[in-house]
Design a protein with these regions (language model features):
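Conserved alpha-helical substructure of the radical SAM core
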Residues: 1-112, 123, 127-135, 139
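Radical SAM enzyme [4Fe-4S]-AdoMet core and its adjacent flexible, acidic
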Residues: 12, 30-35, 39-42, 84-87, ...
């Protein structure tokens, strides 16, 4: 049997979410109740212990469709990865990533934290993420950046954004850069809207060659 070169494992440690983003399947159609809870820590560690002997040290993403920072014991999951020589990544709306949770997660050896920020100003953020948290998230991202520097942590700080109007790509990229990416200093990914939830029904027939949503052509894709 061919040996699988496993580079990334996505383990959902919390299935629910505290946001109701316009473009996300967590909002519409939603998830079954049995998925809206935490994965027990011992089950998580058991999974890690099955991975490492067979596949070495792939990257561990601590989320799937859920919001990982809603798991109150998040630093323990990160530490479990660190103890086994595994990198841990978190993709999050960032609304809980502050105070002790932020500091303890970074201290536990978190490899990367990515803020999802859809909308390049307060008004558009509110529209697409359905909550008026632009200023708060901006501050949390700054606090995270500062704590990483203060502690000489190797944790990377990223951000993720979507183009909202395909006819204004250059303008929106510039706005994301000026309003969030450059002031905070994140490594950013800006994608075209890709309707991955299937929430939107196009009223046209797609003609010609299909185009990419803009995912980075890297070895590790999200």
């Amino acid at each position: 049997m061919e040996q699988i070169n496993l580079q990334r494992v996505v383990i959902e440690i919390f299935g629910g979410c505290n946001y109701t983003c316009k473009m996300c399947p967590q909002t519409t159609p939603g998830r079954e109740k049995q998925f809206l809870r935490s994965m027990p820590l011992d089950q998580f560690e058991n999974i890690l212990d099955q991975i490492t002997p067979k596949y070495g040290t792939p990257l561990i993403n601590l989320e799937g469709s859920g919001e990982p920072t809603m798991n109150k014991n998040l630093p323990q999951y990160i530490e479990a990865c660190t103890r086994r020589g595994l990198r841990s990544y978190i993709y999050s709306n960032g609304s809980n990533f502050t105070g002790n949770l932020m500091r303890d997660s970074i201290d536990a050896g978190l490899s990367l934290f990515r803020f999802s920020v859809i909308g390049y100003n307060r008004e558009l953020y509110h529209k697409w993420m359905n909550v008026d948290n632009w200023d708060m998230i901006y501050q949390y991202a700054c606090d995270t950046r500062d704590y990483i520097k203060q502690t000489n942590s190797k944790c990377k700080l990223d951000s993720y954004h979507l183009i909202l109007d395909p006819s204004c790509v250059e303008y929106e990229v510039d706005q994301y850069q000026q309003n969030f990416i450059f002031p905070i200093g994140t490594e950013a990914y800006i994608w075209k809207m890709h309707n991955w939830s299937g929430n939107y029904k196009p009223d046209y027939e797609r003609l010609g060659q299909r185009r990419s949503c803009g995912r980075p052509a890297a070895d590790e894709l999200t």
